[in-house]
Amino acid sequence: MNLEEENTIFKPLYSLKHSPINAYFSKNSDDFVVRERPLYEFSGKGEHLILHINKKDLTTNEALKILSETSGVKIRDFGYAGLKDKQGSTFQYLSMPKKFESFLSNFSHPKLKILEIFTHENKLRIGHLKGNTFFIRLKKVLPSDALKLEQALMNLDKQGFANYFGYQRFGKFGDNYKEGFEILRGKKMKNVKMKEFLISAFQSELFNRYLSKRVELSHFANDFSEKELIQIYKISKEEAKELKKQEQFFKLLKGEVLGHYPFGKCFLCEDLSAELERFKARDISAMGLLIGAKAYETGEGLALNLENEIFKDALEFKAKMQGSRRFMWGYLEELKWRYDEEKAHFCIEFFLQKGSYATVVLEEILHKNLFE
């Protein structure tokens, strides 16, 4: 794969096989609602205020700027567990120094409300959340499409989903990763935060491409013969047989990096049979590479061969990035839906572990690219 020759936006493969489903989706505050779920209970004591806020059609940074102007707290002194999109209605938690509490007593803003205030010992940091609950309303849904949506949701609930990075990660034109690649190759940029963001977009792009390659492998393992798998992947007959034997959609590979799901340490897949049982029980999941010097390394085998195929253009820049691992396969939790035939509305609710994108799930369900 030559990143320099890429002129089109990469589109990851879907795991489900149905045709596109017709539905209208608008990411507004009535039809897209996100509720953050904290990682821990707030203690009720300490030097930090925890603000439970509801923002509508504001980014997290825009909300912080509004609160900063009201309270006098510098933006860098606020804490948050995750950055949220502008579109939609978001319920999330922010932290700020308690000594500024009095400045919030008369706070009022049409797009930002403070719902509750707690106290806690520490400032909120990125990742200090379990995940997010999402509400999505689809409109103009015909009864025939509602049936397709129900089937797609049941399939995803049963098998899980490919945990791609969402389009939000890649900028307005979907090509932030190219800027990140240029920075790694020596292009200067003074803005350190922007530089880090663009490099992370590059890492995310490669992650998505590798995960898409694994989704393709899983489809091929289901649809092709052992002989064809041997020819395509240059693997042994035993390896091809092992792939065909796996009943679940996403196929695990010996030597790849696994992790305890949803939080836990990385380890190599050595005993494939044993790990398959844990994978089916949703105790572990496969972990894709966010390339960098400190990322847990893949063992010998097909997983490493596929990794090298995707990451070959980036290997010389590995030392310039810290690197880590990210779950490739995730699961919908607390899933429910309802269809109002009279209004032609189809409403979906589910919980995702932190770092997963509801828009990725929606694209998988609809088989449509929301970016376009």
From Swiss-Prot:
Single GO BP term: tRNA pseudouridine synthesis
Gene3D superfamilies for the chain: TruD, catalytic domain
InterPro entries: PsdUridine_synth_cat_dom_sf, PsdUridine_synth_TruD, PsdUridine_synth_TruD_CS, PsdUridine_synth_TruD_insert, TruD_catalytic, TruD_pseudoU_synthase
Superkingdom of source: Bacteria
GO cellular component, one term: cytosol
Segments traversing the membrane: none
Family label: Belongs to the pseudouridine synthase TruD family.
Enzyme superclass (EC): isomerase
Tagged with keyword Isomerase: yes
UniProt keyword terms in alphabetical order: Isomerase, tRNA processing
Primary role: Responsible for synthesis of pseudouridine from uracil-13 in transfer RNAs.
Species of origin: Campylobacter jejuni subsp. jejuni serotype O:6 (strain 81116 / NCTC 11828)
EC number of the protein: 5.4.99.27
TRUD domain boundaries: 160-330
Catalytic activity: uridine(13) in tRNA = pseudouridine(13) in tRNA
Gene: truD
Name used for this protein in its record: tRNA pseudouridine synthase D
Pfam families for the chain: TruD
